[in-house]
Amino acid sequence: MSMVLDETDFGGKVKIKKKVSEIDDNIKESLKDRLEIWWREVLNDAIALCPVDSGALQSSIRIVDASYAPEQFQVTGETGNVLVDSIIIAGSSALNNDGVPCMQYALAVHDGHVMRDGKSIYMGVPFLANALLIHEAELEAILADATDEELSKVTEES
């Protein structure tokens, strides 16, 4: 939601900006525990949906704070307030038994790849994307509920 404040009354603009900032902080605080539970559910489904050979890829699935994520997972170009500051990733910078970084292996399993013979294609199993899709509506409901709760407090105060 965008809001343009263009008024010259006696402190009204400052009061509104302060209240909007307070609402934003309250929504973020309200979301903290709910999102932690939501991420755990996504993680559990990603692990359950991950194809298992040795189990190394499955055991590498984890939730990380977005600010500490590997560079290729950094989100840029977005404006606005960050409400979800975590991401779910699989793989690591460690090498697997073939000397290939696990991150590349995770991408190949998740997104698919051409087999070594060059004649067949492994279609991939998007276990991370599917786990997020399973819980997408739930996330939308969590965000809407937290926003509605905070805005109802504001209307009660007025």
Give the location of each predicted region:
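Short, Lys/Arg-rich flexible segments
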Residues: M1-S86, L95, C102-S158
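Acidic, low-complexity protein-protein interaction segments
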Residues: G91, N96-N97
